[in-house]
Structure formats: C-alpha cells, structure tokens
Amino acid sequence: MDACRPAEKRSRKPAHPLRRNISEDMKNFAENTMNELLGWYGYDKVDLQDSEAADARNRVKRNHISVLKENAVPKPLNVEKKIPPSSSSSSSSSSSCSSEPVRNGDQDPPTVPVSPSASSASPRHNMNVIVPLIKPSAVEDVQNVQIVCVWCQKEGMKRYSLLMGSELKSFCSEKCFAACRRAYFKRNKARDEDRHGDKSPSPGQTLDTPTRLMLKMNNNNSSTRVCDWCKHIRHTKEYLDFGSGEERLQFCSTKCLNQYKMDVFYREARAALTSSKEEENHPKPAATSENQTLLTPDAWESPAKSLSPQTPTASALQRTPVCMRVQMATSPKSPTGPSQGTPEQPRPPHMPLPFIRPPLHAQSLRSPTPNLPHNPPHPLSPTQRVPFAPPPHYPLPYLPLHPTFPPQMPPPWPQPMMMMPYPVFVPIPIPIPIPIPISPQNSHRGVIRSLQEPEKEPAGSQRVKTERCVSPVSASERQVIQCLRRDSVKEERNDTHIQTLRKALYTSVLTSTASASLDGRIVSPASLYSLARSTAIQAASFSLDSSSGQIPSPLSDCEDVKENSYLCGRGNDSANQWTAEQMDCQSDQSKEGKGEEETPQDVEHTYARSVPPKLREKNTHVNTQTHLHTQIWEKNTQVDELGPEQSVRDDAEPAVKRRCLRIRDQNK
C-alpha cells in the first residue's frame, strides 16, 4: 500500500502525533543530556525517577521553553482559584501539576497525570519542579529596583534576574544577561573538555561558589580558566600567569596582558596627577595612603613586593619640579635655593609636570615610579628616564653655588618638553610701506597750489618789484600741465588769455639784476611799469570766442608780448620797450631750456601754455626765430603818434585773427 502512494506524501507528517512507549534507555539518555545542558547554562540538575515524574517535568519544560519568556513557577494561590470544585480535595502538589493543562486549554481531566492515591503513596510527588526563571516584567515594573549589574558592574534598573541556588544575580539589560549566560556555558563546557584533576577554584570563582555551576561528568570535577581581561573562555592550555598570591591573574594571550598593563598604567598616572594637585593645595600626611591597595606596574618585575601605590609624600619636593626649583634658584626674589617649600609658592599653570610617565615603548614596560630621584641607590637607565630630564648624578646642593643666573640665560640643561610640539619662531620679512620725504624743489607739489605759499629764490638773485608778485613754477609742474592740455581741451575764459599775457610779461620782469642791457640799451623799471599798465588795459578790452580754447605756442606768447609792448610804448621809450621784450623772450627761452623757468602762480594757471620738449631741445633755433619776429614787428608797427588806448582798439582784431590762424595750423 505504501508503494502505491505518491512520493510527495511520504514525507507528510500525520495530523495527530503518535504516542509511543519510550524505553528506559531513551529516558536515561534524555535525562543525562538535559542535565548536561542545564549545567552548561548554570542551572540545577534535574533527577527523573520514574515515568510519571518525567512526564510532569516534561510538561513544565514545554511550558517554559526559554528562560527569556519570563514565566514564573505556578503558585498554589493562583491555582486554587482555577481548579474545579471536584478536585479541591486533592493535595497542593497534585493541584499544581494538574492546573497547567487547565490554564493552557487542554481537555484532559485534572486527575489524569497524578492521582490522589499516587500522590499520597509517593512523597516525592509533593516536590515542585524548581526551574530558575526570570521574574515577570510586571513585577519588575512595579518594584523599579536600582541594582548593580553583575556583569557590567553599572548601576541601573533591574531588568533580568537569574536564581543560582541561594544567590540571585540581577542584570540591567538582556545583553548583560546573555553575555553572562554565554560565559558560564563556555566555562562549564571547557571544564568538561579539560578533565584534569585540579580541584582549585578558577580565578573567577571563590570557595563558596555553588557546586551546581561546575559540571559533574562521571564523578570527575573539571575546571577551566577564564581570561581576566576579555572574560572569554579560550581552548588553549597555555595561559599567562601574572602576579602571585591573591592577586594572581591569568590571561589568554599577550594582547590581553598588554592591554591590562596599559589600563593599570593609565589609572596609576591619573591617580598620581590627581593626588599631586591635591597635595599642592592641601598637603596630607603619608600615613593616609598606607591602607590603600592598588595593583600598579611596580609588581611587574618584583612580585614579592607589597602592592601599594606610591602617592606623593613629604619628599615631593625632591621628586618633582626640577625646572621649578631651577627657576626658584635663578629668580632674584628667592635666592635661597630649594630649601624653601614649594606648597607656599603656586606653580604657574603652564609649567610641565616632569613626573608624567613616558609611553610603554620608551620604558620597556617598567614602572618609572620607584626609580625617580627620591631613590638614589638605583639610578635611572637611559630608557627609563623622563625625556630631556637632567641626570640624577648632579644633586641640588650644587645649585646654591650659583644662585643668580642672568634672566636671559637658559638653564644648564634643556627643559623637558613632554613630547609636545615646540614652536620655533622664524623671522619672515614682511614689506612695510615707509613714507619717504621728497624735497619740494625737485618734485611736483600739485597742479593747483595756494597763493599764500612763500616763494623761494636763490640768495644772489634780485627782482624788480611790480604790482603783482607770484611764485615760480618748477619745470616738472610745467610738464604736468602739458599732459593735462593734451588729454582734454576745455573752454577758455577771457581771464585765461589775460593770464597768458601776464605770464609772459611777469616772467620777463624776473631778471638777475634790476636792469638788463641788450645791444647797448638799458631797460629801466619805469618802462616796465608802463608796459604792465598798457597790458592790463588791453586785456580788459578783449572779447574772445569760446572756440579759441586752444593754448598758443611759446612763440605766440612772445609775439603777444611784443604786440602789447609796442602798443603801450610812448615816444622815445618804444625802442627801449622793444629791446626789453626781445631780451625778455630770449631770457625766457633760455631759462626754459635749463629747467629753471619761473612762471606766475594763479588759480587758473593750469591753462597756461608750456614749452614743449621739442622746442626746449632747440633753444638756439627758438632764440633766432624770436629775434627775427622782433625785427619784423619793429618794421610793421610805427604808430607812436597815436595814444595807447586808440592803438589797442585798432590792432585788437588783427591780433585775434592771427591767433586764430595759428590755432588752426596747430590743429591740422
């Protein structure tokens, strides 16, 4: 029949499980396996005596599959409320056992597992199945108990608890609970594998540790080792022993040992720093630290020595502030040396602490504490000294011989830098603008200057006094005016032409002597005065167009002067005036060639005509042309009989026309 069934139906499970009779061998094997698993996880051993007790315990285990389900052991008070009245006469043990199917909805009669007669006949049925479980979360929420976690040693709320015999271990989180259970499991499993006859308790246990935590197989006790740093079970036989006596520790590898040493070293360094700072403010006697026990690196090389921390005592003055004592000895305020106590004088906050330990690779895993200068019989080795510290062979009694060092001189030895970056100041040249004064004679002081500025002339020069006196303008200023004229052409006013005429006239007056001679004729101050007066009258009568904005050339300046001087001449003074104008123009051109020409200074002198550089290079040619123009004007202008005012009116238009023609030629 089975051969005719399809293949896919062979693996199908039956709808209802089949109850089979289990042999005694299988029961014993299940009991041993269950006890082994319970022992690995730190639970009590369960003994199954007969099949009925085995069935009852199996039902309890089915109801409590996992420890994390937080199901408590059935309580008689709660059970009696749910028991039917027909079974109220049964014992408490039978009611507790029979109440489980009722609570879970099973339809079996309550007296099926254990009958009242059977319970009275066998007293072992009265014992409840004790399985260590976690308390319900509702009870914990009501209590809100503050506990110290057994695993992480931190304070927190009680979340999980594990009952181990008479000891109840509490955990703050599921993570700690799982880690502790895993550690016990590995420890018990390793004990089972080792099977050596060492009955001494492991480092993580004490003598009063319950024996249920140790798995018993074939009546042989087996123990294992747990690393005191990583708290893990290693399947290695070569554990590293560290220390002796009660402080004997075991590590599974050199990595754990080194990490433990680093942790101890770090805690010792922090304790030393804290105690030294407290001692500076409030010194304490040395007897207060005798009762303290701290595992320090002192025991790394001397295991027989007592493990007591070396806290700062009264010899702290000899132990630290080497650089502090040097500064005390060198300062003029305290020349007495190190005989005075340091607690009275506050240490600067930036002072490096010389008792800070170097890293472990620099000291070869040795403690620098017992080899400091307070222990002279054992000098420091080169690898154990503090970096840049002075040698201990030169004690402090040598320092009072030289109590006062210069403040600028450094100490005889370099100060400890404590492996910190040392700033080195490197001078970097930074360009800084420095104002350089420039002499006003050789530089351009501005295009427009004030009229009140004093005039500076050579000491040997003399000047003919006129009605208006102006200050000279240097050659560089004339060049600036030349550039302004080339850039933009502005509309000239009538005063511009008046200024042009005055410029040529007044500069011609500035001669080296009061009277100049040319060709045997003398120019007197009277003739110059009359010439200036006639020029002013002629300038007042001019009316020029705005189109004549261009400034005439230096030749036109001389011609204007000649025209005005001829029109202003009277009688016999005309010849003297012509020769004076000729001489003035020549002297003006010569001074411009040398860069020493003096021009009038006025508000509108910007529009004055300056001599171009090409004409300056040809001083001889300019002087020749000026002389020829003077000869031509002497021949063409012979109107001495007319008055000065009439002559100005008659010749005003030809002069303007000639100027316009010159401007047009320059524009071409």
From Swiss-Prot:
UniProt cross-references to InterPro entries, sorted A to Z: RAI2/SOBP (IPR026092)
Comp. bias regions, Polar residues: 305-318, 328-343
Keywords (A to Z) from UniProt: Metal-binding, Repeat, Zinc, Zinc-finger
Amino acid composition bias (Pro residues), ranges on this chain: 345-357, 370-380
Superkingdom of the organism of origin: Eukaryota
Comp. bias (Basic residues): 10-19
Zinc finger (FCS-type) stretch: 140-178, 218-258
Ranges of Low complexity composition bias in the record: 86-99, 114-123
Function: Implicated in development of the cochlea.
Family from the record: Belongs to the SOBP family.
Protein name: Sine oculis-binding protein homolog B
Record organism: Danio rerio (Zebrafish)
Native organism taxonomy: Eukaryota, Metazoa, Chordata, Craniata, Vertebrata
